[in-house]
Every structure is written in structure tokens, then in C-alpha cells.
Amino acid sequence: VLLATSAVGAASEKPNIVIIMADDMGFSDIGCYGGEIKTPHLDRLAAGGLRYTHFYNTGRCCPTRASLLTGLYPHQAGVGNMIRDQHLLGYRGQLNRDCVTMAEVLKSEGYWTAAIGKWHLTRYDNPNDKAADRSSWPLQRGFDSFFGTLPGGGSYFDPKGLTRDNDPTVAEDGFYYTDAISHEAAEVVRRANQMHKPLFLYVSYTAPHWPLHALEEDVARYREIYAKGWDKLRTERYQRMVELGLIEKQWKLSPRDDRVPAWEDAPDRDWQIERMAVYAAQIDRMDQGIGQILEALRQTGQLDNTLLLFLADNGGCSEVIA
């Protein structure tokens, strides 16, 4: 899924560039792509910008991130799969020195560069290890500032590998990772404005990647919606996608996955409702945070000189988590 909008100022003024990435999110999850999940901020961006119906990335998160930041095939950047070193040129598990990142290029052009959220482009993802090779960490690959996690998925309440710049940091009481990413990104917007520098901001949410961790106030809004079951929900999504022009009318709804029973035959339906509601709440919370970032751009007078790009890294997750 990709969503882009741009409204740039004078030709001589360098635009801010803000890239926002969701993690393991399905094509039709958000409202402007047919989903029942409430995403008003993304929907407004879609209405005022460019909504893609054909957009390609890789099937795993690390290769997509490598390609996005370097403009290369992931193997050329050294991340042909995940972050395990397979001792093959294209599968070293972290960014190599034969590639240049967007941050490195934009920094040389006077941009202030910041990465917030999930990194997942280094084999050495423990910030407490003083001897760790930091050559593929954000600050060593062109970013002036970093707050987030070096590894992939993990707890939203106490994430592993939480890092500020090159040093470990801790989750305070009441910490929720999606909110922390949003707050930090909004602060970066305000800081860059005070510095009078164009901004390159890479915001990489972990939502809605497993584990299913959400706040009760968000989950409560979705239980009734998902009580109708996945068969009715997927039919409704399909109909909305046709109405939005995302798919052709002659493209019929695909059969339900053989591994998934009909909703009326599903065991533990209350538990299934809860799972779907929590997943939706994770995306809802991310959209709320995107609203905070947009508001910071608006308050600083930078919104009309900012190119915004929203995408997901690899589509919905098909893994079964025990």
C-alpha cells in the first residue's frame, strides 16, 4: 500500500521529505483502501494527494527497508533476506558499504535527517553491547538523529533494543511504542523548523506487526465491528474496494483461505473478535499519531512545503504465531 501527497513551495525552497512506513499491514486495512479501520488522517491525505493502486516492494521487511533507503535491489545493498549473515555477497544481513542511503545524500544537500522507529538493517542490534559494530546503524548511515528499535518486532510496552542515537534508552512508565514514535516525530518536525533546515524524516512504525498489543480505549471501539465475523467483513471490504476504483468489478472475491473456517464454524469466536479488534486498534493508534505529525507540520508552517509518502513494508503477515 502506498499513499503520497505533495504540495511544495517556491522552486528555490527545498521541500521537507517525510516517509511513514507501517509494518505488516494489509493492502485493504486502512479506510481509503476499503478497510473498516478508522484512519481519518490517512484518508484525508489520500483525498488530497495521489493514491497508488500498483506499488511493489519485497515480501519481507528488511529487504524492503534496504531498497527504500538505497534505491537498489536489496541484494545489492547486502540485505537479500533478513538480518542473518549467510556469508554470501547479497545476504550479509546489514547494509554494506557499496550503497549510499537517502539520508547520506540528503545530508550532503543541507537536510537535517532523522529516523524514528524500527530500523532492522543491522546484525548488531543490541545497543547495550559497547563492542557492537555500529557501521550499519542509523547515525553511521547518514541520519543526524535516531530514536527507535534496532531489531524487528517486539513488545509495544517494553521494546527490546530501544536506542537513542547510538546509546541504549529505557521505556518509562506508561510507554506505548506507537505513541512514542509519533511524539518523537512531531518533536523532530518542530526542532528542524527552529534550525531553519529542510527535513528528511523517516518514520517507521512497528504497528500493526505482531505481537497484538493495543490500548484498551482503542480496542473497545472495534469489538462490535468485528463481531460480524471475517466472512461478512471481507465481503464488505471487497465491495468498498470496487466502489473506490481500486479493483475492477470483474475481479471476483477470492476464496477464503483453506486454513480458515467459515465464521459460523470458527472456534473461540470471542477470542477471534478480540484479535481482530486489537489489530485494528494498532492501526487506529498509528493514524492518530500520523495526525500529530501532520499537526506539527501545520503549526510550523511547513505542511505546504512537504512531500509525504506513506507505505507498508510487505503487506499483511501470513505467519501463524503460537
For each predicted feature, which ranges?
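Formylglycine-dependent sulfatase
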Residues: 1-322
